């Protein structure tokens, strides 16, 4: 099961030197994220603003209940950055169009967010918007329907520390984050294809 309102945004930019950088927030060495181990992502869902705030990233490892869904939906966003201030967030679903119903595993998304938070990958986003050092994280949405059936959706989270949650500037940053996710994903896919061609 995937969220509604799938939206694919394109970008000509591609990440450079994937897998050759140093440590990122969250305990991941991007050099450990070997190309063949990185997940394939072809589509990125429009950012979903979460009606939640956290006192700091240290409080985001536990599920938080959304009031907008009659207490049937919770989120764990697993943020980790260099700011100990309040934050709000967007949930961004991702999937591979060849198998859109397949759930992307949390460890795969954790590796992917390490690439996204790499300083060189983040450079353009940080120049255009006021963001912290590691705004991306691997997140989970938990749902429980009227019959008590539970489901989960793993995705990516983009969090923000701005003083006016979900303002125009905040949304612009989230949309740029969505485009960055797709750009990096396409760069990984292209690099994998080149690698396969070189092995022939």
From Swiss-Prot:
Protein name per the record: Tegument protein UL55 homolog
Native organism: Equine herpesvirus 1 (strain Ab4p) (EHV-1)
Chief site of localization: virion
Cell compartment(s), UniProt: Virion tegument; Host nucleus matrix
Family: Belongs to the alphaherpesvirinae HHV-1 UL55 family.
Source species, domain of life: Viruses
Residue ranges, annotated region (Disordered): 1-23
Biased composition range(s): Basic and acidic residues: 1-20
Pfam families: Herpes_UL55
Coiled coil segments of this chain: none
GO cellular-component term (any): host cell nuclear matrix
Listed InterPro entries: Herpes_UL55 (IPR007622)
Keyword set, alphabetical order: Host nucleus, Virion, Virion tegument
Biological process (GO), any one: viral life cycle
